[in-house]
Amino acid sequence: MKITALASAILAVAQGALALPARAPALDITLSQVNNTRIKAVVKNSGTEKITFVHLNFFNDPSPVKKVSLYRNATEVEFTGIKQRLRSDGLSNDALTTLAPGATYEDEFDIASTANLTQGGPVTVRTQGFVPIAMNNKIAGYIPYSSNELELEVDAEKAVAVPASIKPLDRRTKITSSCTGNRATVLNTALRNAASIASKAADAASSGSSALFTEYFKSTSGNIRSAVAARLKAVASEASMNGGGSTTYYCSDPYGYCDSNVLAYTLPSTNEVVNCELFYTLQEVTNDCHGQDQATTIIHEFTHAPGVYPPGTEDLGYGYSAATALSTSNALNNADSYALFANAVYLNCQGQTGGQTTWDGYSQPGQTEPGTQTMWDGYSQPGQTEPGTQTMWDGYSQPGQTEPGTQTTWDGYSQPGQIEPCTQTMWDGGSEPGQTEPDAQTMWDNFYQA
């Protein structure tokens, strides 16, 4: 039933390339074979501007993360490494890479360490997705990446000799002995919150706002809505089982792959979920649209686990701006799409950025967000009008002005003589810009205090 719902949904949408912004900077990945299953990736900044991005869950991450996808006879080979959820701000400098235009770096890794290639034979290797860009050690947007397609002929005997990155542990209990005392209390509360939030999100996916659903999944199709609802219901069910479900939960890191930037990670091949130290610093439930918390981190991780709902999701777009740029088929397969949608349903965040920078800080500052909310473009049109609150900026040091009564002010450039609602006239653009309008409303004084 689960597989049928998801399969029919995916078949209903195009399986083409990721939906990419037209002018976005990008990273080009060139894959080549070093020997047998050892691969070299050359990462190149193909844009015209310097970029700083998060290389965790990407090339140069020393953890056994999914850097490439492997296919045998058009069927993807199971990944046996880890899928991490990263913090969105306060990133350490060692998690970041900066590349000048045209600059490159290399990463070598062995694909047999995170996949069973012991039968040998032909294997196809490729990768694509979005990598988060960072400003002031905070995720501020995304850039796309894609690679060539590499065809390998794997020597089975040599592949067998490659040690697996993850060694099996004794998983006799569903919630392990690492979950005691305060950590057990924290986990149980987080699971209850995750169950409640995922259940509400499942209902919203089935029959809630079509605009909100489209913001994250780019479709109003009944099949797509049913597929999203089914996965979220499965997540809610798993979180409600308090250790009796399909996943094994660790309250501390038995494998040693947590660091100061990782909230939690999942081993999809064994349906294991691990909380990192950073998890315990998160709020139980955030009040910020698209913020991170313990509850949605569990939702994110449970979507990775195929034992909860098959197949498990990937990390194709991380953070609000990347997740909402994905095509329908890719959003269905993206963990953060579910976590962010659940957060948006819970907080009623339709069309809101909630502190997440919507433009990418580089070549596309003028992003138009779902729900018809247009962001300012940072250049020639400072006087954008936002829905509802109609926030303006004066072109100088105070871009986020909010006018009383949702009244729109002049845009600081070519139209100073705006006529406002209720026939109230703004300053006339001539010699007396500091007019005092009816009802004691003082206009802009033609300098720095809008």
UniProtKB/Swiss-Prot annotation:
Chain intervals with Low complexity compositional bias? 398-409
**Propeptide-annotated positions?**
20-172
What keywords are assigned to this protein?
Cleavage on pair of basic residues, Disulfide bond, Hydrolase, Metal-binding, Metalloprotease, Protease, Secreted, Signal, Virulence, Zinc, Zymogen
EC class, as a word, reads hydrolase
The coenzyme or cofactor needed here is:
Zn(2+)
A Gene Ontology biological process term: proteolysis
Q: List the disulfide bonds.
A: C179-C251, C258-C276
Signal peptide position in this chain? 1-19
The positions flagged as active site in the entry are E301
Spans annotated as Disordered: 364-416
GO CC annotation: what is one? Answer: extracellular region
Summarize where Zn(2+) binds, as residue positions.
H300, H304, D315
Q: Which GO terms describe its molecular function?
A: metal ion binding; metalloendopeptidase activity
| Localization terms from the record | Secreted
Catalyzed reaction equations = Preferential cleavage of bonds with hydrophobic residues in P1'. Also 3-Asn-|-Gln-4 and 8-Gly-|-Ser-9 bonds in insulin B chain
- Co-factor: note: Binds 1 zinc ion per subunit.
Composition-biased stretches (Polar residues): 364-392
List its EC numbers: 3.4.24.39
Major location category of this protein: secreted
Any Pfam family: Peptidase_M35
Q: What is the protein's known function?
A: Secreted metalloproteinase that allows assimilation of proteinaceous substrates. Shows high activities on basic nuclear substrates such as histone and protamine. May be involved in virulence.
Question: What family is this?
Answer: Belongs to the peptidase M35 family.
Q: What is this protein called?
A: Neutral protease 2 homolog AFUB_070680
Give the taxonomic lineage as stored in the record. Answer: Eukaryota, Fungi, Dikarya, Ascomycota, Pezizomycotina
